[in-house]
Amino acid sequence: MDYSHIVSTRGFRVVKLEEVRMKKCVMLVGVGMFLLAASVQAQQEETYDYWRYQRQMVRQGQQAVFMCNGLFTSNRTLEQVFAQELAFLPEPIGTAGGGDYEVDYERKGVVIGSGRDVPKMRAAFREGIGCVILPPDQTLDDVAELPHLDLPYPDEEPANTPWPQGDLVSAAPLPSYVDGQALDAASDWAFERESSEQVTLSLLVLHRGNIIHERYAPGVDMSTRTRTWSTAKSIASTLIGMLVDEGKLSLDEPLGFDFLPESADGDDPRTEITLRHVLNMSSGLETVDNRGLEYAIGSGLSYWAGASSTVGARSRALIREPGTNWDYENYDTLLAVYAMKQALGDDYSEFPRRALLDKIGMQNTLVSTDRFGDFILSSQVYTNARDLGRFGLLYLQNGVWNDERLISREWIDFVRTPAPATVGQGGQYGGQFWRVPEGRGDVPKDAYSTSGNRGQYTVIVPSHDLVIVRRGLDYGRQGFDRWGLTREVLKAFELMPAE
C-alpha cells in the first residue's frame, strides 16, 4: 500500500511524508515557534540555535511539573525536590533558596521563569489527579475553568485495613527457606550504588502475597508518591485489557477513530491500525519523541507545555506497514488510551479508579490528565511502592483479586508475549510490559516487568511467587539493572522447595 499521501502535523503546520523520508527542508511550527532545518543534501552549517527557546520553554515546563508534584503530590520539601527530582534537569532554575520561580502554597501551584525571553510556565495541583501543566497563555487563575473530574476515594481507611487491600501488616517470620541475610544483601545492592546517578527511593519484595522486605531512603516512607513514568503504560494496558475482556474493545479490529489531518478523499490507511499494533509499539506511525522529551515536539508538548495528548497522538504520518516495525513511542500508548476513552464514553473519567485502583487497594495512586481531561497514561501516574506491589500481585495471582477475576489469563498471556516486530530484535517487549532479554541466563525466563524512566520497576516472577518493586529518582545515562536486582533477590530463594 502507498502511504505517501498521508501527512503528519507537529504543532500546527502540515508536513508531507515525502519531506520526512527525503530529509528535505522541513518547517515545524509548535506553540508559535519555528525550526528551520537545512537540507541534508545541501550540507549547510547552521549558525543559529532555532531550538533554544523551545528547549527553554519545555524545560521550564518540566521544572514546573516536577516541583508541583514534588511539593503537593509527593509532599516533599523544596530542598528534597531540588536535590532529587530536579537532578534530572540539565540546568534547573534557581535553588531551594530562591530564583526565577514562585510557589503558591495556597493555590498549590508553581510558576517557573522570568518571562523575559520565553513565557513563564505554570503547573497546578488538583485533588485526586495531581498536577496539570498549563500552556504559556494560561495562568493559575484559569485552573478553575479546566474540565472537572470528581474522583472520590473509597471509604475504607488503608491504615486499618489488612494487607494487601490495605496497609495493615502483621509481623511474621520469613519462610524457613528464605535466606534473610541474602535478602538484606540484595537490598544493599539496590540502595548502595557505585554511581551517584542511581538513587533508590524504595524497595519492596512480596512473596506469596506477603511483604517480606520493605526499605525506604531517608525522607521517603510508604506513603510517598512519585511519578511512575512509563510503568504507567502497564497500568494503561491493564485497563484496556479489561475492556477487551468485556468485548468493548478488540485487539485486532481497527482503533475506530479518525486521525488528523483527515484524509481529503476519505482513504486513510492509518485507520487500519489496530489496538494490538499500538500496544505492541508497532503502529507504523512516524516516531516523534526524543530522549528526555526536551524539545517542543511529540509527547513532550503534552507532558511539559500544555498541548492536547490526543491531538498530538493522532497527528502522525504512517511511514511503515502497521505491525512490521517496533519503535518505542509514547504516542502509541496514548492512541490506545484514546480508544479506551471512545469505548467508555461518559464512564471514562471514573474507570481507572472504579475498575482497578479501588478494587485492589491502590488508594495512594493518582492518574493525571492533560488540561483537556484526557488521562496521560503513558507516563503521568503518581504512586508508592506498596500500590505498585498490589499491581504486580494482581498479575502474580493470574488476574484474580479477592476471588474476583479482574483480567483474563488470555490478557496476561498477551502482555507477556513478544511483539511480533521484536522477534528479530530479542523479543524484549510485549503488550506494554517488558520481557527478560534473550541471552540473560541469570533470571528465570518467566519473569516480566514494568519499566519507567528514572528507575521505576515492578518485576513479576511467577516461578518463585515473587513481586519486586524498585522506585528510583535516577538521572544521567547509567540505567538501573532491574534484572540484576532480580538476580540478587533470588539468591535468597536458593533453598525454596520446588512446587
Model segments located where?
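Active-site helix/loop module of the DD-peptidase/beta-lactamase fold
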Residues: E246-L285, S315-L318, L344-T383
